[in-house]
């Protein structure tokens, strides 16, 4: 990735260290800078301390950010890494003149794309995550998905399951709620979820309301050791968090999934983002960009 020109530094200014400070800067939400910057940094064995600075839209704000970057460099002797996306030239130039190692994450891709498309870019601040007449319908659909998911979290309601696009099943604390919310917020997916609790284990059955939507069911499971560790943080030294109880619940629920031929995924070693993406792929759900 090509980097923007920052202030000139001598060879003595380059310090090899795996501990680096990172700035994510934008004239919008800074989500794009965070996502792309994190994706690049994940390729390196570095320990980062990050600061996100959204809505750097004017000269005064840019000067304050530049001073912050320079002060950190003077204090640590190590150049901060700066991932930025700023449309206004005079604001952008101030950041570029800082003592950070500057990466204009969008511009690095714009030039080759301009050549391929045969078009000149027309940058507009807030276009990526902003709201206007062109995407209002998509925004409303995403909010509706979030509302639906919250109303059908943790088995709160089994009504309206015909409107669900996926129904997640699993024991308590296996990742159903965060995955459901991520599906709704990131992809506009209406996701319900239903927990199997300790009291269900003596006679574990699939509720009729769920059997009626067999094609929408997807199970999450988890290693008992990981489940016990998570539960210990919430309810230390209880039956709920014991290894014996965790093994029992996971075993019973996995058997239920197999009996009813419900597709399922072990969430132990996956992030919420990875779990959600795998569910979309396995269930054949269309992912939407917002």
Curated annotation (Swiss-Prot):
Record's catalysed reaction(s): [pyruvate, water dikinase] + ADP = [pyruvate, water dikinase]-phosphate + AMP + H(+); [pyruvate, water dikinase]-phosphate + phosphate + H(+) = [pyruvate, water dikinase] + diphosphate
Protein source organism: Enterobacter agglomerans
UniProt-listed PANTHER family: PYRUVATE, PHOSPHATE DIKINASE REGULATORY PROTEIN 1, CHLOROPLASTIC
Binding locations of ADP: 170-177
The family this protein is said to belong to: Belongs to the pyruvate, phosphate/water dikinase regulatory protein family. PSRP subfamily.
Protein name from the UniProt record: Putative phosphoenolpyruvate synthase regulatory protein
UniProt-listed HAMAP family: PSRP (MF_01062)
Superkingdom, natural source: Bacteria
Pfam families xrefs: Kinase-PPPase
Keyword tags: Kinase, Nucleotide-binding, Serine/threonine-protein kinase, Transferase
Function: Bifunctional serine/threonine kinase and phosphorylase involved in the regulation of the phosphoenolpyruvate synthase (PEPS) by catalyzing its phosphorylation/dephosphorylation.
Annotated EC: 2.7.11.33, 2.7.4.28
Keyword Transferase tagged: yes
UniProt-recorded Gene Ontology molecular function terms: ADP binding; ATP binding; phosphotransferase activity, phosphate group as acceptor; protein serine/threonine kinase activity
């Amino acid at each position: 990735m090509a980097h923007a020109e920052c202030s000139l530094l001598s060879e003595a200014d380059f310090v090899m260290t795996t501990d680096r400070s990172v700035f994510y800067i934008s004239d919008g939400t800074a989500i794009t800078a965070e996502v792309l910057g994190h994706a690049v940094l994940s390729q390196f064995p570095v320990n980062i301390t990050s600061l996100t600075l959204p809505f750097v839209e004017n000269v005064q704000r840019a000067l304050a950010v530049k001073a912050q970057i320079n002060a950190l460099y003077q204090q640590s002797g190590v150049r901060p890494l700066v991932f930025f996306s700023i449309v206004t030239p005079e604001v952008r130039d101030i950041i570029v003149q800082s003592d950070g190692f500057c990466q204009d994450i969008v511009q690095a891709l714009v030039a080759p794309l301009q050549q391929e498309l045969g078009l000149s870019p027309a940058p507009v601040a807030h276009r990526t995550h902003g709201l206007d007449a062109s995407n209002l319908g998509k925004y409303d659909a995403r909010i509706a998905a979030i509302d639906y998911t919250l109303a059908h979290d943790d088995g709160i309601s089994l009504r309206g399951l015909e409107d669900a696009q996926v129904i997640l099943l699993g024991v308590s604390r296996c990742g159903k709620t965060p995955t459901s919310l991520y599906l709704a917020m990131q992809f506009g997916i209406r996701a319900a979820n239903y927990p199997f609790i300790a009291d269900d284990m003596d006679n574990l059955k699939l509720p009729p309301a769920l059997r009626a939507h067999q094609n929408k069911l997807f199970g999450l499971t988890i290693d008992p050791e990981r489940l016990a560790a998570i539960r210990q943080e919430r309810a230390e030294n209880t039956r709920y968090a014991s290894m014996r109880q965790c093994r029992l619940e996971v075993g019973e629920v996995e058997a239920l999934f197999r009996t009813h031929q419900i597709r399922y995924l072990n969430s132990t070693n996956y992030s919420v983002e990875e779990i959600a993406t795998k569910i979309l792929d396995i269930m054949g759900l269309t992912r939407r960009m917002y």
